UniProtKB/Swiss-Prot annotation:
<dbReference type="InterPro" id="IPR011060">
    <property type="entry name" value="RibuloseP-bd_barrel"/>
</dbReference>
<dbReference type="GO" id="GO:0006207">
    <property type="term" value="P:'de novo' pyrimidine nucleobase biosynthetic process"/>
</dbReference>
<dbReference type="InterPro" id="IPR047596">
    <property type="entry name" value="OMPdecase_bac"/>
</dbReference>
<comment type="function">
    <text>Catalyzes the decarboxylation of orotidine 5'-monophosphate (OMP) to uridine 5'-monophosphate (UMP).</text>
</comment>
<dbReference type="InterPro" id="IPR014732">
    <property type="entry name" value="OMPdecase"/>
</dbReference>
<keyword id="KW-0210">Decarboxylase</keyword>
<feature type="binding site">
    <location>
        <position position="124"/>
    </location>
    <ligand>
        <name>substrate</name>
    </ligand>
</feature>
<dbReference type="GO" id="GO:0005829">
    <property type="term" value="C:cytosol"/>
</dbReference>
<feature type="binding site">
    <location>
        <position position="16"/>
    </location>
    <ligand>
        <name>substrate</name>
    </ligand>
</feature>
<feature type="binding site">
    <location>
        <begin position="65"/>
        <end position="74"/>
    </location>
    <ligand>
        <name>substrate</name>
    </ligand>
</feature>
<feature type="binding site">
    <location>
        <position position="215"/>
    </location>
    <ligand>
        <name>substrate</name>
    </ligand>
</feature>
<dbReference type="InterPro" id="IPR013785">
    <property type="entry name" value="Aldolase_TIM"/>
</dbReference>
<dbReference type="InterPro" id="IPR018089">
    <property type="entry name" value="OMPdecase_AS"/>
</dbReference>
<protein>
    <recommendedName>
        <fullName>Orotidine 5'-phosphate decarboxylase</fullName>
        <ecNumber>4.1.1.23</ecNumber>
    </recommendedName>
</protein>
<dbReference type="GO" id="GO:0044205">
    <property type="term" value="P:'de novo' UMP biosynthetic process"/>
</dbReference>
<feature type="binding site">
    <location>
        <position position="194"/>
    </location>
    <ligand>
        <name>substrate</name>
    </ligand>
</feature>
<dbReference type="Pfam" id="PF00215">
    <property type="entry name" value="OMPdecase"/>
</dbReference>
Length: 236
């Protein structure tokens, strides 16, 4: 008897909408076998756990992108709550340090449902001069590598980082570390406010595991066509 192969969509659509109804309406036009969904700070503030649970009920795997950054106990409790919500992925700021990340991982492992726990390294909108203003020396790439190594040694499943760093992260950390890449734009799309961007095919070739795509899909005249085009470009 043949067992069906579970889909593993590589595209994570960022539901960056100002109203929950808009996000829900948009999600209804998508296929859980073609993409996962990301719920960020604005949408979660508007819709809360109820929205996330509704999306999960519709068959979507959800990346809860709240970037927790606080004392270890507070972050641990937040990560456990997110895990019990049933999300596929949740993230914390690597700059919170080893103790915070280890507490977060322990909390996730103790939950009845265990999502991937991902560390945020350096925001894709930041460049060397931006880092210098907050007291971090070196380039974004150097800081991403340092924080990714810290996240890995703290037990996290992967990091959020731009595609430009993916090949170096693969060399330094290995193939089993999950790399979640925002700043993804199809070749004909506007770059908007993200500096370190790359096309979907180039990002996957560089070593990215999952691609976060927002406005090029959500603001497209034909979102499904764009999603299908991206999937085709990465061989999905």
């Amino acid at each position: 008897m043949n067992q069906s192969v579970q889909p593993d969509p590589k595209v994570v659509v960022a539901l960056d909408f100002p109203k929950t109804q808009l996000a829900e309406d948009f999600a209804r036009h998508l296929d859980p076998q073609l993409c996962r969904l990301k719920v960020g700070k604005e949408l979660f503030a508007l819709g809360g756990p109820q929205l996330v649970e509704k999306l999960i009920t519709q068959g979507f795997e959800v990346f809860l992108d709240l970037k927790y950054h606080d004392i270890p106990n507070t972050v641990a409790m937040a990560c456990r709550a997110a895990a019990e919500m049933g999300v596929w992925m949740v993230n914390v700021h690597s700059l919170g340090g080893r103790k915070m990340m280890e507490a977060a991982k322990e909390a996730v492992l103790s939950a009845s449902h265990q999502p991937l726990l991902i560390g945020v390294t350096i925001l894709t909108s930041m460049e060397t001069e931006d880092l210098a203003e907050i007291g971090l020396t070196g380039t974004p790439k150097e800081n991403v590598l340092r924080l990714a190594k810290l996240a890995h040694s703290s037990g996290l499943d992967g990091v959020v980082s731009s595609a430009q760093e993916a090949s170096d992260l693969r060399k330094e950390i290995g193939q089993d570390f999950c790399l979640v890449t925002p700043g993804i734009r199809p070749a004909n799309a506007d770059v908007n406010d993200q500096k370190r961007i790359m096309t979907p095919a180039d990002a996957m070739a560089a070593g990215s595991s999952y691609l976060v795509v927002g406005r090029p899909i959500t603001q497209a005249k034909d979102p499904i066509a764009v999603l299908n085009e991206i999937n085709a470009s990465i061989g999905r």
